[in-house]
């Protein structure tokens, strides 16, 4: 990929072929879809075109060739005010984004333009947003655990370095808060760079995240520099056209690939929300006139998801560890969008509304959440055994709940009563105060080491803390804090 400067067209690749500077005209505008007619050579599929109207330049991406002289394009910005007959110029290359250290601490849009009002991005290199996945011989197998400091995650569904993690949950169960906590914890403990792609989510949350990152020191803003910043942000929020929302994840991924391939870093790539990527693809697909498949999704759902996910991997140079929030429509995990995402993930962290309703946060379902790294060869025999014991106790409690609801606790055997008591303590101990939620709760956040997590749960499973009240286990870090809380409860009783 040849180098370009910031002053050149924000989209065109330099040294473009005979396909650059071809001029066409708009023949039809249907919302985000624009048809353009050319007299001679047609631009390639996925090429970027520029159309200037009302004093603004909008980028179009070629999606289909619909005739000998006509292409159908997706607009990356609003087409309000665009008229038939307007001149369109082909750039001869794909949409490209600036990459490199200059992007850290900045907010970019889908075509790589800064939207944080801090001037142009200091970068002398650009990557196209559509890139090939690393070849088979370039990839590296990852078996190292990424410690997050969140008890329920580290114990029951540990994340792999260079792996892909899905955060599944319906509306309002806490996906974004967990992502913010992970960015906070891992930026502090891990020290590497992160890229955050805001795909079709609330602009307010994107704004909050930007200021929270400044407060946490993850983004450092100087007079005209962002030196020392650890994260680059790319936003295509829910008020933007479907073209921008369908491509913003690819723009963010190109930024992450630079740090992996050119600088050999272990990069964290956050996507909030991968469902909106699929949703935008469905909107675009319908506008392009494709026949929808199951539940109205695009027929190319699996292909589009695969093209994105296959680029997120570990190579011999570095790794990209991805954490993706997945909105689950109507809490239905069999919906084609979350189901297509499941196939690519190494770990799934499922958030459950019934757990959130009990006031247990993070509302991670300890029985539904899975990880292929929960294996004695990777996490060690002790960790594996403790995790399985915790799940066994919680599963037994779940199966006893119907009996308890009908007959009451008194009808249970002594062994079952003991299991229920321990399960309720474990359930509460899986809750944890978050640093990013301090402003709402007033409770200081806790980052718990993996050793403390395994040791604490091992002791609870063994019955060493059966004498403590259930309330002592709620919203604490390590087991020592639960003991101290029990003492305090005894004093105030």
UniProtKB/Swiss-Prot annotation:
The lineage of its organism: Bacteria, Pseudomonadati, Pseudomonadota, Alphaproteobacteria, Acetobacterales. Keywords: ATP synthesis, ATP-binding, Cell inner membrane, Cell membrane, CF(1), Hydrogen ion transport, Ion transport, Membrane, Nucleotide-binding, Translocase, Transport. The keyword Ubl conjugation does not apply. It is an enzyme of class 7 (translocase). Its EC number is 7.1.2.2. Gene3D superfamilies: 2.40.10.170, Bovine Mitochondrial F1-atpase, Atp Synthase Beta Chain, Chain D, domain 3, P-loop containing nucleotide triphosphate hydrolases. ATP binds at residues 169-176. It catalyses: ATP + H2O + 4 H(+)(in) = ADP + phosphate + 5 H(+)(out). This is ATP synthase subunit beta. It is found in: Cell inner membrane. It is a peripheral membrane protein. The gene is atpD.
């Amino acid at each position: 990929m040849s180098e370009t400067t910031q002053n050149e067209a924000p989209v065109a690749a330099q040294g473009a072929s005979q396909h650059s500077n071809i001029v066409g005209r708009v023949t039809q505008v249907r919302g985000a879809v624009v048809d353009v007619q050319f007299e001679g050579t047609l631009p390639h599929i996925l090429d970027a075109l520029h159309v200037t109207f009302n004093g603004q330049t909008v980028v179009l991406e070629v999606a289909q060739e619909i005739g000998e002289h006509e292409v159908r394009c997706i607009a990356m910005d609003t087409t309000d005010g665009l008229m038939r007959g307007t001149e369109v110029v082909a750039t001869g290359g794909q949409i490209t984004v600036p990459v490199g250290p200059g992007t850290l601490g900045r907010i970019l849009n889908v075509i790589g333009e800064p939207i944080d009002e801090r001037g142009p991005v200091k970068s002398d290199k650009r990557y196209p947003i559509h890139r090939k996945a690393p070849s088979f011989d370039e990839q590296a197998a990852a078996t190292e655990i990424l410690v997050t400091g969140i008890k329920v995650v580290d114990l029951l569904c540990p994340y792999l370095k260079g792996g892909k993690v899905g955060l599944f949950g319906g509306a309002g169960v806490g996906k974004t808060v967990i992502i913010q906590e992970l960015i906070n914890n891992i930026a502090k403990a891990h020290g590497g760079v992160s890229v955050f792609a805001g795909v079709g989510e609330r602009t307010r949350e994107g704004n909050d995240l930007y200021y929270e990152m400044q407060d946490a020191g993850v983004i450092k803003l100087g007079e005209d520099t962002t030196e020392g910043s650890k994260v680059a942000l790319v936003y295509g929020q829910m008020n933007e056209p479907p073209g921008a929302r369908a491509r913003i994840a690819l723009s963010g991924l190109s930024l992450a690939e630079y740090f992996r391939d050119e600088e050999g870093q272990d990069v964290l790539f956050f996507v909030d929300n991968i469902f909106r990527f699929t949703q935008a693809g469905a909107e675009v697909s319908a506008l392009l006139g494709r026949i929808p498949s199951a539940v109205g999704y695009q027929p190319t759902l699996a292909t589009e998801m695969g093209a994105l996910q296959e680029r997120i991997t570990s190579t011999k140079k570095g790794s990209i560890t991805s954490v993706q929030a997945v909105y689950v429509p109507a809490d239905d995990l069999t919906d084609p969008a979350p189901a297509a995402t499941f196939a690519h993930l190494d770990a799934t962290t499922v958030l459950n509304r019934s757990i959130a309703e009990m006031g247990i946060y993070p509302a991670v379902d300890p029985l539904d959440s899975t990880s292929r790294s929960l294996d004695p060869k990777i996490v060690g025999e002790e960790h594996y055994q403790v995790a399985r014991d915790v799940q066994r106790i919680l599963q037994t409690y779940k199966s006893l709940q119907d009996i308890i609801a009908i007959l009451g606790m008194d009808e249970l055997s002594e062994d079952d009563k003991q299991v229920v008591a321990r399960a309720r303590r474990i359930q509460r101990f899986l809750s944890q105060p978050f640093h990013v939620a301090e402003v709402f709760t007033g409770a200081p956040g806790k980052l718990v080491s993996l050793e403390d997590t395994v040791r604490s749960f091992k002791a609870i499973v063994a019955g060493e803390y059966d004498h403590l009240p259930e309330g002592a286990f709620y919203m604490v870090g390590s087991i020592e804090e639960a003991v101290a809380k029990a003492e305090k409860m005894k004093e105030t009783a």
